[in-house]
From Swiss-Prot:
The lineage of its organism: Eukaryota, Viridiplantae, Streptophyta, Embryophyta, Tracheophyta. Keywords: 4Fe-4S, Chloroplast, Iron, Iron-sulfur, Membrane, Metal-binding, NAD, NADP, Plastid, Plastoquinone, Quinone, Repeat, Thylakoid, Translocase. [4Fe-4S] cluster 2 binds at C74, C104, C107, C110. This is NAD(P)H-quinone oxidoreductase subunit I, chloroplastic. Belongs to the complex I 23 kDa subunit family.
Length: 166
């Protein structure tokens, strides 16, 4: 007889515990009900990126001295620098510079360690394409400045997101 009573008590304790867990989940759900939505309508609304956002790399061909510091500090040896030694002036002449953004991890080491500041990070983050080979940018594509989303009248920019209270 006693085993049946203890089983009934265990069943009651499990029921109370399950009801408590469901109630806690319901309270958490209700606390989130009065918050503003965090999502945005992406193609028509875009967030203004922060000042230190690491987007596509911008390259200035005239400033580059082909020192290859960017290649040495890159964790995956990504930038491809082709240069030719000019014997009459004893300097390197840059021929080609390219970065494959399909492989790039956007760590920013190349920008940080560049001695001539010919590399900089932009706020451009829309790099998606249908073919991987289109992500390999040469010096001409890297030299393009991104279009600012603030100047585009078809896109509504969202400056401040609602603060999330934890």
């Amino acid at each position: 007889m006693f085993p049946m009573v203890t089983e009934f008590m265990n069943y009651g304790q499990q029921t109370v515990r399950a009801a408590r867990y469901i109630g806690q989940g319901f309270i958490i759900t209700l606390s989130h009900a009065n918050r503003l939505p965090v999502t945005i309508q992406y193609p028509y609304e875009k967030l203004i990126t922060s000042e230190r956002f690491r987007g596509r790399i911008h390259f200035e061909f005239d400033k580059c001295i082909a020192c290859e510091v960017c290649v040495r500090v890159c964790p995956i040896d990504l930038p491809v620098v082709d240069w030719k030694l000019e014997t009459d002036i004893r300097k390197k002449r840059l021929l080609n510079y390219s970065i494959d953004f399909g492989i790039c991890i956007f760590c920013g080491n190349c920008v940080e360690y560049c001695p001539t500041n010919c590399l900089s990070m932009t706020e451009e983050y829309e790099l998606s394409t249908y073919h991987r080979h289109e992500l390999n940018y040469n010096q001409i594509a890297l030299g393009r400045l991104p279009m600012s989303i603030i100047d585009d009248y078809t896109i509504r920019t969202i400056l401040n997101l609602p603060e999330i209270k934890t």
